[in-house]
Structure formats: C-alpha cells, structure tokens
Swiss-Prot record:
This is Glutamate--tRNA ligase. A motif ('KMSKS' region) lies at residues 237-241. Zn(2+) binds at C98, C100, C125, H127. It is found in: Cytoplasm. NCBIfam families: gltX_bact (TIGR00464). Disulfide bonds: none annotated. GO terms for cellular component: cytosol. Its cofactor is Zn(2+). One of its GO terms (molecular function) is tRNA binding. It holds the Pfam family tRNA-synt_1c. Monomer. It catalyses: tRNA(Glu) + L-glutamate + ATP = L-glutamyl-tRNA(Glu) + AMP + diphosphate.
Length: 471
C-alpha cells in the first residue's frame, strides 16, 4: 500500500506554527514511507477565505521547503463532485432532505439545553413522508447510524470510541446548494486516496462523523492521528500575545527555515536525547508512535538558540541567500564591501538572527554620518590621536591586505607606543565602525577595506582635533 498524507489548511489567515507543525509531521510521515504528500486548500468558507491567505500559506510552505507531490487542490473547484455524491446518497437513502425552519431548530435547541441535554437535531425529517415542492428551501442531512459506536485507533492517542447516539444527523448540503466542510473532507480523502490523516486534536470530534460517512459511501477509512495543541510558555494556547505565530513572521524576524523546522519537529516528537536534526535525519527517524499526546509549550529562547546554531553550522553561502532578503529590507547597498558569505562568517557568533545581522552590518558597506555618542566620548579623546595616527600610517604601508597583516599593524603600533592593545584597538574600532562593539578588529578592518578604513581614521582624527579646539 502506498502511503499518502495531506495537509489541508483553510485559507482564512496566515500559516501559523501549529499548522506548519502538522504539515511537517504529515510530510515527514510520507517521506519516511516513500509515500506522497498532498496539499489541499479547504476554501469552502467563502466569506472568510481570501487569495491573500492562500498566497501566505504557499509562501510558508515554500519557505520551509515542504514540497508537495499533488495539488494544490481547491475544494471550491470540486463542488460538482460533492453534489454528485450527495445526490447519490439521497437516492440510496443514506442522506435525506430536511425542511425544518431556523425557528424550529432554535426552539429545539433551547428546549434541549433547558433540560441539560446536548443540543442535536431530533431527526424529524428523517422519516417524514410529507410532500414538498421541488423549489422549497431545504438542507441535506447525513443519516447517521442510530445504534452502535464508532471506534478508531488513533496513532498518537490510542483507541477512541464515540457512541452513535451522541452524533446527530449533520448537514452535508446547505440551503444555497453548497456542501459543508465535514462532507467535502470525506470525499476529498476518498478521491485522493489518503491513507493517513494527521491533523490537530481539535478535529477529533469530526472524526466519527467522517468515518460514518465514509462507511456509508463504502469507501476505505484512513488511519487517523491527532496532534496535541501548542501552548505558550505560560501554559495557555499559543496566540499572538505570545509573540510571532505566523511562519513568515519568523522569516521576517530573521530565523532560518532549518531552525524553525528543527524546533517544530521536536515540539511534541523526540528521538532519544537528540536535539539537532538535519532534514534527512527527520525523515529517517520520524514515527507517529514517538509523538506525545500531551500539549507542548513553545519556548522562543530554545528556537533562538537553534537559529544561532544553524547560522554558524550551515554553509555561509547558503545562509547568505537568506540574509540577502534582510539586507534588502534595510536598503543596504552591498556592492562595495565584503561578500555576504564572508559577512556571515564575521557576524555569525555575535548575531542570533539574520535580521540582527543585517541591522548591524551597515558600516561594512556604507559610511556612517556620526560616531556613537557614548563610544566617541569614551574613546575618541585627545589621548587617542597618536595611536590612531601611527596605526593609520602602518595600515597605509601594507601592500598585501590579509587580516593577519592588519593584526600585525595594530600590534606593532601598541609595541611602538608601549601601550596595551586596548589603547590602540578601541579608538580604532570606533573610528572604522562608528561604534564601540564589532567582531575581531583585524578581520573587521580587513573586511571594511584599506582605503575606507584609512578615510574613516582620518575622519576620527578630525573629530578629535575639533574636540581639542573646543577645550
């Protein structure tokens, strides 16, 4: 049997981390078994579904490189198929037309709730022989079995049982002729030959209804696995108040897709004590029986740690392709300065996100208007004039410009003036970067370049001279 899974989001908003984890688990399960992964857009909610949301879902899936083998399928393009199946069910007696008014249904609901009963349709039209005009408004309901129970072996939670007496005859076609969500899902899973349905635990109550419809259609019943919810670090359901929840927001905040995938796969699944997983290792080791049935707590600090790891562990050339987007957001012209891959090597240890890296690299490519106020006050004092003049001249004398030669020039200046490296290094750092912090000074000056470094040292000397004149 060929394994076939699906990810079926509703395009009413962005792709959130809970949906992304479900997609990842479905994708991994299919890949682990050499199967296929289907993308299906469940857009039957015509009022809330938007093209922008569909695009956001696609963007998130593509950014995470969760490629699909079939689709995307759109439920709104399959209405003829759904209605054909409903008409067949009406002929076979597994569905029936219901003419009950909204007023009657509301009164029934209030009466049941007053008695402490679970609100449900009472089946009035199920056995009715009243004649109705062809154009009289009605819905179509599924004739749910009235005896026995539905039992399914959830691959994460174990056996789950529902009594059919708890399930009412759900509506499968509305008065406007449109099929409902629970019915469309069933026909889609049947037609697309889905073998394993991996989805959130909020769908558990839909499962017995969907199984009963599948059995009525004499269709195969897939295997179900319901993943627990994701909570914030306060134990409450993850929401916007906990920070970013959109996959693309994490991209915007400077996270690598490898970091988010690694974090999400471990958010409810484990393989021994291993924390870092390549995509290939995820595929190799992933099993549903290792997925926890308990809710998981989202920990941003852990994700940040993983992101920092991947910034330094992945090839700099690859990280640079993701950094490029953030550089563009900052409007930095990188034509005059180090290659982005070299920048990743320079700033990788200091920066935990690519956004932070982009926001802290401008001085490598563009001249700054002024020195940081605290740094210039502390380090661009008259006492720094001589060290800057000497190191400038030594840098100017270098004919070959590797970082080690820059280091020798700085060290030689300190030796000549008989001062500590800090007396030379700190004024030089402020002079060439405009700030009091940077990566190692020799590689920083090397990356900025000889001409630009000397120009900036001269600018710092002019600043010191002005400061001396004002005293």
């Amino acid at each position: 049997m060929k394994i076939k899974t699906r990810f079926a989001p509703s395009p009413t908003g962005y792709l959130h981390v809970g949906g992304a984890r479900t997609a990842l688990y479905s994708w991994l399960f299919a890949r682990n078994h050499g199967g296929e992964f289907v993308l299906r857009i469940e857009d039957t909610d015509l009022e809330r579904s938007t093209p922008e949301a569909i695009e956001a879902i696609m963007d998130g899936m593509n950014w995470l490189s969760l490629e699909w083998d079939e689709g995307p399928y759109y439920q709104t393009k399959r209405f003829d198929r759904y209605n054909a199946v409903i008409d067949q069910m009406l002929e076979e007696g597994t569905a029936y037309k219901c003419y009950c008014s909204k007023e009657r249904l509301e009164a029934l609901r209030e009466e049941q709730m007053a008695k402490g009963e679970k609100p449900r349709y009472d089946g009035r039209c199920r056995h009715s022989h009243e004649h109705h005009a062809d154009d009289e408004p009605c819905v179509v309901r599924f004739a749910n079995p009235q005896e026995g129970s539905v039992v399914f072996d959830d691959q994460i939670r174990g056996p789950i049982e529902f009594s059919n007496q708890e399930l009412d005859d759900l509506i499968i076609r509305r008065t406007d002729g449109s099929p409902t969500y629970n019915f469309c899902v069933v026909v889609d899973d049947w037609d697309m030959e889905i073998t394993h349905v991996i989805r959130g635990e909020d769908h558990i109550n839909n499962t017995p209804r969907q199984i009963n419809i599948l059995k009525a259609l004499k269709a195969p019943v897939p295997v179900y696995a319901h993943v627990s919810m994701i909570n914030g670090d306060d134990g409450k359901k993850l929401s916007k108040r906990h920070g970013a929840v959109s996959v693309m927001q994490y991209r915007d905040d400077g996270y690598l897709p490898e970091a988010l995938l690694n974090y999400l796969v471990r958010l409810g699944w484990s393989h021994g004590d291993q924390e870092i997983f390549t995509r290939e290792e995820m595929i190799k080791y992933f099993t549903l029986n290792a997925v926890s049935k308990s809710a998981s707590a989202f920990n941003t600090d852990k994700l940040l740690w993983l992101n920092h790891h991947y910034i330094n562990a992945l090839p700099p050339e690859y990280v640079a392709t993701h950094l490029q987007w953030h550089i563009e957001q900052e409007n930095i012209d990188t034509r005059n300065g180090p290659q982005l891959a070299d920048l990743v090597k320079l700033l990788g240890e200091r920066c935990k996100t690519l956004k932070e890296m982009a926001q802290s690299c401008r001085y490598f490519y563009e001249d700054f208007a002024e020195f940081d106020a605290d740094a210039r006050k502390k380090h661009l004092r008259p006492v720094a004039r001589q060290p800057l003049e000497v190191v400038r001249d030594k840098l100017a004398a270098i004919t070959d410009w590797p970082a080690e030669n820059v280091h020798h020039a700085i060290q030689a200046t300190a030796d000549e003036l008989e001062v500590g490296m800090g007396k030379v290094g700190m004024p030089l750092r402020v002079a060439v970067t405009g700030a009091g912090q940077s990566p190692a000074l020799d590689v920083t000056v090397h990356a900025i370049g000889k001409t630009r470094s000397i120009e900036r040292i001269n600018k710092a000397l002019d600043f010191i001279a002005e400061r001396e004149n004002q005293q």
